[in-house]
Curated annotation (Swiss-Prot):
This is Lon protease. Keywords: ATP-binding, Cytoplasm, Hydrolase, Nucleotide-binding, Protease, Serine protease, Stress response. GO terms for molecular function: ATP binding; ATP hydrolysis activity; ATP-dependent peptidase activity; sequence-specific DNA binding; serine-type endopeptidase activity. It catalyses: Hydrolysis of proteins in presence of ATP. The active site is at S692, K735. The lineage of its organism: Bacteria, Pseudomonadati, Pseudomonadota, Alphaproteobacteria, Rickettsiales. Induction: By heat shock. It comes from the Bacteria. Homohexamer. Organized in a ring with a central cavity. The keyword Nucleotide-binding applies. PANTHER family: ATP DEPENDENT LON PROTEASE FAMILY MEMBER. Residues 605-786 form the Lon proteolytic domain. ATP-dependent serine protease that mediates the selective degradation of mutant and abnormal proteins as well as certain short-lived regulatory proteins. Required for cellular homeostasis and for survival from DNA damage and developmental changes induced by stress. Degrades polypeptides processively to yield small peptide fragments that are 5 to 10 amino acids long. Binds to DNA in a double-stranded, site-specific manner.
Length: 818
């Protein structure tokens, strides 16, 4: 076997032909199609020039997408080639040329030219081969490469292996073998160029062997994948063919009608004939059933149609529950299940009375709005019981997709009707009482706005023609009695306009005691298996439980605490053999643990700049403390506590009013100019907004600047204008309940809210002294512990404004805390 050794000659200047996505090897003949202008000129120059004798230097581009490659876009090593046929002109101005690779060369430098690319090239000499018969490793490597290439040829199936392998077997020179094999491999240009640039024969064999093995692995994986796919396709075709044969056999034997498929078809036909479908729905059902009969039962489309027909035919078309309304019985049911809320129950009875007369629902949709735990959902259940209708409930909290209401179109995988149609099927009648729970908790995003989708559902003029996207036919919702619940009126205006709002306020302590005694305790005893005489709780203990372990407008927390007491009672009866458990104020803490809340006034002492305000939230009323401190500055006011825009504007308005009337309040203007006020509303992590804290902010600023403390037992609420007027507020009942829970004795409210006092329970009026104020001056007179001494324009004391002091105590300035 011969091993080549290259002999270098002197360099020469040659025209250069850049190649796209191809590498030419020595001793390889190949046709090329050349179209670039410079490349064509290079070929013509090589043929016409007597010095080059049809010689041209071929070199591969690093990036084949570049049309006009620069020297840095070309590899350094290429091949000197002979043009062995005349150029053949093609219609697109390109030329076809046949070239034959001669030997390798390395570019020394490129020579600039406008018409063609030339380079000075150092050419490798012809190989001189020496004998080395003892090189067993090289011979083994040569044979391995040829065998691997033979396997590659068989796997690639691009040509007969013997046509390629036989000529290679005849070649003895290692480098020529490598060149011939590399030219046939379907590998990347960079890999071929790498082989071209390696001179050591043994290294060249190793590189080409590794590339062949990689290509064999890829081809083997492709063949396995092809066989797998082919097998799957053949299996599917076989199943389809057998199913068609089975159908034909069943048809011949008359067994098709007795099979499962026949039963399903018979069931569909029977339902279509017996169900009181609308004309549109019946036509749709018949059309889809005809399509279904012609389909393969296991096909995906047949499954979709079958599911659709089940939904369409299982709806309560034309089914109405005979609901006879007895107003006396309805009132009795409402009174038994719900304590208080007389006005709400009266409105429901009025609604039922009209419904009894007209026999159809044309009035507004009722929307029960109130804090959690006041009985909105249970009230809707009682309404259903009172009118003798089926009750279904949809929880709308967190729904953001319009398709949850209207359904998904059948084109989607896993599509199904919306919640309205789903629950109509569940109700199994066309006139249930439908509760839309937590309607204010819906959201919206890119998938649509469910609140807008509800507009059609709640419109009594149009819901007769409600169309679900899945059903694609109209379904009559006009006989459905819709009731909605919400914690707040944070609803889109068009949706709110379709409903009549009924407010459910929080319960007083006396009402909670009555609810616990007559409703919760009997229910919980039954749930925990306690007999009537095995467990009892005193009224005093109930009051303490409400005050120290719950702080809510409703009764859910109270129910949880009572359930906790009864669980411990059951455990004590079974383990300690106690016959009776009695819960009193003395042992309440033993059962419920450490007190969760404090019951008493919001502040233990009357302090400067500390004012008790009142707030109204979705969960009811609450006490809102407002604090302020004075720091040296430039007359600015800062506020913290996660305040909303409306509340920030209210603070600015209150500050401007007090500063503009500083002399009246006995404050020198210099005190504002030389100091900043920092106003804070705890708790800092809870968002707060609204204008009703204006009077409390004014009082806090006046108290701070005059150094007069605010009465700890006084709370206030009201919006303040720049003229000092106190404007009306909302949520008065909830705010007064919060004041009562905080042991507030006096509450100052706007005079415009005096009319709302008729809605306030008598026990609240007895326990709280409610004072009406038209302007902020009246509020400050009641709230501050000391009289205000006004200053005239000359900064002289002129007026002493006396105020009524509820505690009849005026602490000395030395004892005031700030």
């Amino acid at each position: 076997m011969s091993i080549g050794r290259a002999v270098n000659f002197n360099s020469t200047v040659l025209p250069v032909l850049p190649l796209r996505d191809v590498v030419i090897f020595p001793n390889i003949m190949l046709p090329l199609f050349v179209g670039r202008e410079k490349s064509v000129h290079a070929l013509e120059y090589a043929i016409s020039s007597s010095s080059h004798q049809n010689e041209i230097f071929l070199i591969a581009q690093k990036d084949g997408s570049i049309d006009n490659p620069e020297p840095e876009n070309l590899y350094e090593v290429g091949v000197l080639a002979n043009i062995i046929q005349p150029l053949i002109k093609l219609p697109d101005n390109a030329v076809k040329v046949m070239i034959h690779g001669v030997r390798r060369g390395r570019v020394i430098e490129y020579i600039s030219s406008h018409t063609l690319l030339q380079a000075r090239v150092a050419l490798d000499g012809h190989y001189e081969y020496g004998e080395n018969e003892d090189n067993i490793d090289l011979e083994a490597l040569r044979r391995s490469v040829i065998d691997a290439f033979d396997n590659w040829c068989k796997l690639s199936k691009k040509s007969r292996p013997e046509i390629i392998i036989d000529p290679i077997d005849q070649v003895k020179e290692v480098n020529q073998i490598v060149d011939m094999i590399a030219s046939h491999l379907n590998i990347k240009v960079s890999d071929k160029q790498n082989i071209l640039e390696v001179y050591n024969p043994k290294e060249r064999l190793k590189k080409v062997f590794a590339l062949i093995e990689r290509e064999i692995s890829i081809l083997s994986a492709q063949n396995r994948l092809y066989k797998t796919i082919k097998s799957q396709v053949e299996s599917t075709q076989k199943v389809y063919y057998l199913n068609e044969q089975l159908k034909a056999i069943q048809k011949e034997l008359g067994e098709f009608e007795n099979g499962d498929e026949g039963n399903i078809l018979n069931e569909f036909e029977k339902k279509i004939n017996e169900t009181k479908l609308s004309e549109e729905a019946k036509e749709k059902a018949i059309t889809d059933l005809k399509r279904y009969k012609k389909m393969n039962p296991i096909s995906p489309e047949a499954t979709v149609i079958s599911s659709y027909l089940h939904w369409l035919l299982d709806l309560p078309w034309g089914k109405y529950k005979d609901a006879k309304i007895n107003l006396n019985a309805a009132k009795k049911i409402l009174d038994e299940n719900h304590y208080g809320i007389e006005k709400v129950k009266d409105r429901i009875i009025e609604f039922l009375a009209v419904l009894k007369r007209v026999k159809e629902i044309k009035g507004p949709i009722l929307c029960l709005v109130g804090p959690p735990g006041v009985g909105k959902t249970s009230l809707a259940k009682s309404m259903a019981k009172a009118v003798g209708r089926d009750f279904v409930r949809i929880s709308l909290g967190g729904i953001r997709d319009e398709s949850e209401i209207r359904g998904h179109r059948k084109t989607y995988i896993g599509s199904m009707p919306g919640k309205i149609i789903q629950h109509m099927k569940k109700a199994n009648s066309c006139n249930p009482l439908f509760l839309l729970d937590e309607i204010d908790k819906m959201g919206s995003d890119s998938r649509g706005d469910p609140a807008s989708a509800l507009l059609e559902v709640l419109d009594t003029e149009h819901n007769k023609h409600f169309t679900d996207h899945y059903l694609e036919v109209e379904f009559d919702l006009s006989s459905v009695m819709f009731v909605a619940t919400a914690n707040s009126l944070n609803l889109p205006h068009p949706l709110r306009d379709r409903m009549e709002i009924i407010q459910l306020s929080g319960y007083t302590e006396d009402e909670k005691i009555s609810i616990a005694t007559h409703h919760l305790i009997p229910k919980l005893k039954k749930e925990h298996g306690l007999h009537q005489k095995e467990w009892e709780i005193t009224n005093e203990a109930l009051y303490e439980l409400i005050r120290l372990y719950t702080r809510e407008s409703g009764v859910r927390s109270m129910e949880r605490e009572l359930a906790k007491l009864m669980r411990k009672a059951v455990k004590a009866i079974l383990t300690d053999k106690n016959k009776k458990i009695s819960v009193e104020t003395g042992n309440l803490q033993d059962y419920l643990g450490v007190r969760k809340y404090t019951f008493g006034i919001a502040e233990n002492e009357s302090l400067v700049g500390i004012v008790t305000g009142l707030a109204y939230t979705e969960t009811g009323g609450d006490i809102l403390m407002i604090e302020s401190v004075l720091i040296p500055g430039k007359g600015e006011i800062k506020y913290t506590g996660k305040l909303g825009e409306v509340m920030q504007e209210s603070i600015k308005a209150a500050y401007s009013y007090v500063r503009s009337n500083c002399l009246f309040f006995g404050i020198k203007p210099e005190k504002f100019q030389n100091n900043d006020i920092h106003l804070h509303v705890p708790e800092g992590a809870v968002p707060k907004d609204g204008p009703s804290a204006g009077s409390a902010v004014c009082t806090s600023i006046v108290s701070l600047m005059t150094n007069i403390p605010v009465n700890k037992s006084v709370a206030m609420t009201g919006e303040v204008t720049l003229r000092g007027r106190v404007l009306a507020i909302g949520g008065l009942r909830e705010k007064l309940l919060a004041a009562l829970r905080g042991s507030i004795k006096t509450v100052i409210i706007p005079s415009e809210n005096e009319k709302d006092m008729q809605e306030i329970p008598a026990n609240i009026k007895e326990e709280i002294n409610v004072i009406f104020a038209e302007n902020i001056d009246e509020v400050i007179k009641v709230a501050l512990m000391h009289p205000i001494t006004s200053i005239d324009d000359n900064n002289e004391i002129s007026v002493s404004t006396s105020i009524e002091n509820k505690d009849n105590t005026f602490p000395s300035s030395e004892t005031l805390k700030h």
